[in-house]
Amino acid sequence: IIALGVAFFSGLKITQSVMVHSADVYLKDLQFYDYRLVSTLGFTEENVEALADKEDVRAAEGAISAEVLYKDAGENERVIKMHSITEKVNKLKLIAGEMPQSADECVVDSALFSGDAIRSKLVLSENNTADDLDKFAYKEYTITGLVQSPCYIQFERGNASIGNGRIS
């Protein structure tokens, strides 16, 4: 019993350092951001370049994200957060399929979609506001792959100001 207790305690003691190391390697490999600046008015390319030119900034990129309603395979409306794909920061890890090659293609979160979603359509709902729909060049996107993002390392995908209030 003592040996079992010692083994259990040793396992618990080393687990933290192993988990921290694993998370550190994962986040470094995918270039997870250190700081995220958000503006309802947006940033200009000059703003992003000014940040990138700072001596202690390794990489800075502008990105766009928007919460929208889409229709799932059962025609139910769900909330999804769409992100532009960046090259230097918050790199995506491809799990299945391939990265988009054209503007009407997208990849989706492997925690929310299965491999069956590849080559299917992600259709934006007509119940989105006109302002939200105007943010997109297309109303329908072909899913080309499943990815993991360092922005979502937990089960929850966040809250939304539309739909049922949950990104799912």
List each model region and its residues:
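Hydrophobic alpha-helical transmembrane segments of multi-pass inner-membrane transport and secretion
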Residues: 1-17
